[in-house]
């Protein structure tokens, strides 16, 4: 766990909630419903376009900004919602394979370097970083160096008592790893969304959670 320059400024700040026209996470909300209550016109027109280059994730929208990942360049890019002007860029330690989640003035995302990042939405300053991977082992995948236990970009944030382990606080849910059957399995990690501190970790591997025996011990061919 590493505190960033914006940690003290945001730790005690509630931040603005979601607006009706926002789309702050993958598929719009924590239920991944893919729906919105905003009025969407049947006739659309293009307001702006901007060249960013390379593979891009789908965008998310919160307040006056649009956020997306430039996947292979390890970047999170923030754009002005009305003009498309680049507000800031942040370079992470590996590929970011899907859009970030914007929550109460914070931009949260997982990275293929095995970490979860929290940035200040207004300027991209780091708030905190947490290594969800059990160690800092690396390998090469698709011509990129990344963690043995990568974290997918679109982390899930649940708040308002949705997670009993955190009471009324907000929780970041993410998984580090590639498969239950290699490299010691996968790590299901829950973090305090404000402080970045670990709430709990569950190892998902090839052993039965109650007996400790291999899951395929009783499989008959």
Predicted regions and their residues:
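Aromatic (tryptophan-biased) beta-strands that constitute blades/sheets of beta-rich domains
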Residues: 1-57, 67, 71, 75-77, ...
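Repeat-blade elements of multi-bladed beta-propeller folds
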Residues: 23, 53-76, 93-117, 144-188, ...
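Short, ordered coil/turn segments that flank beta-strands lining enzyme active or ligand-binding pockets
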Residues: 42, 82, 103, 112, ...
């Amino acid at each position: 766990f590493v505190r960033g320059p914006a940690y003290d400024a945001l730790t005690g700040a509630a931040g603005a909630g979601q607006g009706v026209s926002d789309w702050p996470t993958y598929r719009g909300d924590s239920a991944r419903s893919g729906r919105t209550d905003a009025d969407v016109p049947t006739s659309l027109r293009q307001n702006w376009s901007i060249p960013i280059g390379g593979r891009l994730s789908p965008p998310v929208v919160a307040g006056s900004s649009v956020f997306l990942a430039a996947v292979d360049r390890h970047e999170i890019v923030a754009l002005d919602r009305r003009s498309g002007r680049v507000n800031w860029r942040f370079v992470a330690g590996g590929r970011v394979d899907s859009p970030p989640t914007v929550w109460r003035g914070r931009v949260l995302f997982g990275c293929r370097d095995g970490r979860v990042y929290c940035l200040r939405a207004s300027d991209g300053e780091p708030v905190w970083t947490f290594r969800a991977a059990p160690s800092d082992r690396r390998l090469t995948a698709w011509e990129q160096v990344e963690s043995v236990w990568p974290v997918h970009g679109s982390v899930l944030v649940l708040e308002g008592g949705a997670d009993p382990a955190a009471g009324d606080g907000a929780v970041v849910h993410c998984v580090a790893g590639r498969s239950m059957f290699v490299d010691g399995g996968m790590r299901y990690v829950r973090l305090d969304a404000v402080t970045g501190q670990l709430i709990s970790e569950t190892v998902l591997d090839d052993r039965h959670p109650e007996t400790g025996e291999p899951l395929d011990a009783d499989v008959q061919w």
